[in-house]
Amino acid sequence: MKNQDVAIIIPSRLNSTRLIQKPLQLIGSITLIERVFQQVNKANIHHTYVATDSEEIANVIKKISGKVIFTDSNIPTGTDRAYEAFKLIPNNHNIHYIINVQGDIPFIEHRSILKIIEYLKNSEYDIVTPVVKVDRESIEDSSNVTVAVDYTGKALYFSRSPIPHGAEEFLYHLGIYGFRKNALEKFVSLKQTFLEKTERLEQLRILENGMTIGTCLVENVPISVDTEEDLKKAIKFCKKINKLGL
């Protein structure tokens, strides 16, 4: 199996402020967290784990032969949870790259994850994250994050406001991060920053501390489930792909 030096970690917390027990909500016949895990698992990375504080989530994943790492319920962010899980992986000294996949993207394409891994290994960036080209109508909601980049694809700034101002086309940021191990270790040691707290975007902590984030272009914007309305969209999309036999 390739990529033995890579770990994929899916942080999943049971309590959500906007959607009760979000990971256990059904999309079709299976839960949100099951769908995320099954999609990610198509990347065929041996070290693929769900990091959670919940026995219920753990039981769901174990039933489909997934691997679970228990983490503390008081961990502040998904990235911090991913790091705590990484430290508990057996023989983790052989792992040099950690992919943090948000646990609310039920139709994430495994090809996007493989592209992140390839780009991370073949660049000098501390972190790599995927983006999709979209029009203004696609990013009006403040839950959608855009990124401004330089001509090489290096991230300059992330915002919940459409950036750059006046553009007709934007780069929509997907909530997946590929970290070099030393970059993840540095990130979790840093205090929250002004811009991070202002925008409520933890990736700004990275930029404010002089670390580099490279972006890689992917084709599709996967549905992210954060609200009841998002869940309805995901269920509708699931019915559509089932009807098409995809």
From Swiss-Prot:
Top-level taxon of origin: Bacteria
GO molecular function list: 3-deoxy-manno-octulosonate cytidylyltransferase activity
GO CC field: cytosol
Pfam family, one: CTP_transf_3
Family: Belongs to the KdsB family.
PANTHER family per record: 3-DEOXY-MANNO-OCTULOSONATE CYTIDYLYLTRANSFERASE (PTHR42866), 3-DEOXY-MANNO-OCTULOSONATE CYTIDYLYLTRANSFERASE, MITOCHONDRIAL (PTHR42866:SF2)
HAMAP family linked: KdsB (MF_00057)
Name of this protein: 3-deoxy-manno-octulosonate cytidylyltransferase
Lineage: Bacteria, Pseudomonadati, Pseudomonadota, Alphaproteobacteria, Rickettsiales
